[in-house]
Design a protein with these regions (language model features):
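Flexible, low-complexity segments enriched for small/polar residues
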Residues: 3-6, 11-25, 50-63, 70, ...
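Short, solvent-exposed helix-helix connector turns and helix-capping sites enriched
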Residues: 9, 31-32, 396
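N-terminal accessory alpha/beta regions
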Residues: 23-178, 182-203, 223-237, 243, ...
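A general structural motif at alpha-helix termini
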Residues: 30, 41, 215, 404-405, ...
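Active-site substrate-binding loop specific to GH73 endo-beta-N-acetylglucosaminidase modules
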Residues: 118, 123-138, 145, 152-156, ...
Length: 541
């Protein structure tokens, strides 16, 4: 009886808390399932799988050079085949479309379900021909940016399929979705994956304040929520710009159409989504004041690297953050009734620290984590216990996770979560030891087909996290298709449906009609497809 309980808890540890069991993993967890999770919470160095990837500062530099090459080509008339002809690919919109196609090409060949309509893969090996209107350097730079983006996706899924610390990896993906950015936002496109490895992975076992600051100062978030364009109305930069516009008007010249101003997007989403929650007690005036406090938070330019940025300070050369004092709104701020008299960058940092330790933040984060790991409607007592642990530890995330693990509600036999498409695909990869041969295009197209494209949520709120959101429409039918396609990629030597089911789910669920159905399947491949599509596999129990 005791062994049966431990076996069941081992399956929960690997599937409910982790990302799905690899072959042999349930046996490793069965002696002490809770201890198996606790052991993963010990900080370790980041995986070498990410070591060769460029940091965001390097990507910013490459992107700048790419745009400079494009601009130079446009000024030189490159892309014109003759007098009167329209310039080929000579505007920012078409350029962005081409970069987007390089970053998210369709799989070539393979199952038709992988080939999402409208997505076609360009030949990234082909240099520009003399007649295509683009200089070779321009195409080379675009290919390098695209390769960098694909390398990040490849590393992410190679790691998730092989890691022995799948609980920590699930936590990483939880926070990545909590601080969601989307590749659909052009300026943020190249930085979504780097943000996960640069801002989230190093702090997932640390303090929430450090995690929060790292994310909110990352180029991905600053660009996604438009803070790079936020300028204080009374800032030095705004004053100079206004004076210049007045001189232009006096000389009879047209003023620029785009005007400088405050952008509230980042401040609002930090309060509503990242910390306090929508019912966290803040008002519009708090959002405005906070937005003023973080004016000047921007991204590195080449001149900042060379020490000639003038108004730039507080630069993080690896992640690409910079504080521009000339764009910062001067003066004191009042947020949630507290006065902040700090100067410059320190003002926004002080507000972030207080938001991180606010009781509403403790409640909001605890509810989301409990919902992610236990149930769509988690027990209020569990949420309250986690919120208390968060506050008494002053935002220590490991203490928060430990409280979750040690709570009896988290191990209830009735607790379960329906897998998101990403959860489903990753758990199949782990159960079937499936690799994508350093080419993640088939994988990304599969997730697109299932409704969860990689780093592309529909809003800053991230991907939904309840069963109702993922079971609607034709989602279940698409999972059956995906199960069949993924079963094809399992090595022949591992195509034993019953053994695979027991290794991934434990022996307890693999009985009766379910086990009989796996044995009666027309072929081992069909049996694996039946396993992957089964309710037992689709739920994190």
């Amino acid at each position: 009886m005791r062994d049966a309980i431990k076996a069941s808890q081992a399956a929960s540890a690997a599937n409910r808390f982790g990302l799905g069991a690899k072959p042999g993993e349930l046996a490793a967890a069965s002696n002490d399932p809770r201890g198996w999770l606790h052991q993963q919470l010990r900080p370790t160095s980041l995986s070498t799988v990410f070591a060769a990837l460029p940091n965001s500062s390097d990507i910013l530099q490459r992107e700048y050079e790419y745009k400079q090459t494009k601009r130079a080509g446009k000024q030189a008339g490159i892309g014109q085949s003759g007098p009167g002809n329209a310039q080929v690919e000579g505007n920012a919109a078409s350029d962005a479309r081409k970069l987007r196609r390089h970053e998210r090409p369709a799989a070539q060949g393979g199952d038709t379900l992988m080939q999402t309509p409208g997505m076609r893969a360009p030949d990234m090996r082909r240099d520009a021909s003399p007649s295509d209107g683009e200089p070779p350097e321009f195409k080379r730079q675009r290919r390098e940016l695209a390769r960098s983006a694909w390398a990040d996706i490849d590393a992410r899924y190679r790691w998730v399929a092989s890691t022995d610390a799948s609980f920590v990896e699930r936590l990483t993906r939880f926070w990545s979705n909590h601080f969601a950015v989307s590749v659909d936002k052009g300026p943020a496109r190249l930085y979504a994956a780097p943000m996960e490895r640069e801002a989230i992975r190093p702090h997932v076992l640390g303090n929430f304040n450090d995690l929060l600051l790292a994310v909110e100062t990352h180029p991905a978030m600053l660009r996604y929520l438009d803070n790079v364009a936020s300028v204080g109305a009374d800032s030095i930069f705004a004053t100079r710009t206004e004076q210049r516009m007045q001189r232009m008007a006096a000389q009879g010249n047209a003023a620029p159409k785009r005007k400088l101003g405050l952008n509230e997007n980042l401040a609002r989403e930090i309060m509503e989504l990242h910390t306090l929650g929508v019912d966290g007690g803040y008002k519009q005036a708090d959002v405005v004041e906070f937005a003023r406090a973080i004016t000047g938070w921007g991204t590195l330019m080449p001149r900042d690297r060379q020490g000639s940025g003038g108004d730039a300070s507080g630069a993080n050369i690896s992640t690409g953050f910079v504080f521009r004092d000339a764009a910062h709104e001067p003066g004191e701020r009042v947020v949630l009734g507290k006065r902040y008299a700090q100067d410059g960058q320190a003002q926004g940092q002080a507000i972030l620290r207080d938001l991180a330790l606010h009781p509403a933040t403790a409640q909001h984060l605890s509810l989301k984590i409990a919902r992610h790991f236990v149930a769509d409607d988690p027990p209020p007592a569990l949420v309250a216990r986690m919120a208390h642990a968060y506050l008494v530890s002053r935002g220590d995330l490991t203490h928060l996770y430990t409280t979750l693990i040690d709570s009896p509600e988290a191990w209830s036999p009735t607790a379960r979560k329906f897998k998101t498409p990403d959860d489903f695909v990753v758990s199949v990869m782990r159960a079937g030891d499936i690799a994508f041969d350093r080419d993640p295009r088939m994988l990304t197209q599969l997730l697109e087909h299932l409704g969860q494209p990689v780093f592309n949520p529909r809003s800053p709120a991230g991907y939904p996290d309840t069963a109702a959101d993922w079971m609607a429409g034709d989602g279940l039918w698409k999972r059956i298709q995906a199960a069949e396609a993924l079963a094809d990629r399992v090595a022949v030597a591992q195509q034993n449906p019953v053994a695979a089911a027991q290794a991934s789910l434990g022996a307890e669920p693999v009985t009766g009609d379910f086990a009989a159905g796996l044995r009666r399947a027309g072929s081992p491949r069909e049996g694996l497809a039946l396993l992957f599509a089964s309710p037992a596999f689709q739920w994190r129990a």
